[in-house]
Amino acid sequence: MTALHFISGLPRSGSTLLAALLRQNPRFQAGMSGPLAGLFDALVAQMSARNEFSVFLDDAKRERILRGLFDSYYSDCAAEVVFDTNRGWCARMPAIAQLFPDAKVIACVRELPWVIDSIERLVQRNVFSPSSIFNYSTGGTVYTRANDVASQDGMVGGPYDALKQACYGAQRDRLLVVQYETLTAEPVKIMHAIYEFIGEPVFEHDFGRVDYDVTEFDERAGTPGLHTVRGAVKAEPRDTVLPPDLFNRFVHDAFWREPDKIPDGLQVV
């Protein structure tokens, strides 16, 4: 593994589509969200003072162990450039900067009402398959589900707070915010921006045929279609399945679309 970068950001915002595109480059390895962020957090916790043997660890050892986690996980990967995907990485920017000084983070974002809409659409599409997103619960309404995912520890609320932390934090110069709306409407523009951001030669991608299928994982999670990417990259306007009052609750949350709220050094494309 010669280069490591990260894909993070909001759910239902194009991270799997972006990974599917990056995979077209034979030099790159990318995929859906993986286990490394969870393993990383578990290791950090176990090396803390709550473990009585932590007295044998200093920060230099901790850093070597954490780097070793990535080296071990990707030891069988022949790609020259690896992109590890997880929504948790935005909250780990200080650690990433210290462990991997050359690593960049791509944060995929989307207007919040459409993130909530996308999740609800999946639920309604799979009415006979309760989703792991809601602990396989069969009850609730569109309102309770939206409140659940938008909560501070929810599937959307947690990553949203982490995104804001990354965008306004000291490491924002190594962060590229990629808007789903631009990715689907102008994929060439997005990919060129990414190649420039990570300092790699541009590759000509096939935007007319993008495939990435992890059906087994999605079905096990009770949410078929959660990560499936097929066909051409294109914007597909549609009506929302959210009630108007619920949709309007989130319309002003896309801070990255307001120039006066974008701090110096943060790139948004």
Regions found by a protein language model. Give the residues of each.
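Glycine-rich phosphate-binding loop used to anchor ATP phosphates in small-molecule kinases
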Residues: 69-95
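PAPS-dependent sulfotransferase catalytic core
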Residues: 1-69, 76, 124, 213-221, ...
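PAPS-dependent sulfotransferase catalytic domain
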Residues: 60-76, 117-197
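PAPS/PAP-binding and catalytic site of the sulfotransferase fold
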Residues: 14-28, 96-100, 120, 177-202
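Short aromatic-enriched loop/helix-cap "lid" or pocket-rim segments at secondary-structure transitions
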Residues: 41-46, 96, 117-121, 128, ...
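PAPS-dependent sulfotransferases, especially Golgi type II membrane carbohydrate sulfotransferases
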Residues: 1-5, 149-169, 173, 188-189, ...
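Conserved phosphate-donor/acceptor-positioning beta-strand/loop module used by diverse small-molecule
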Residues: 85-88, 96-122
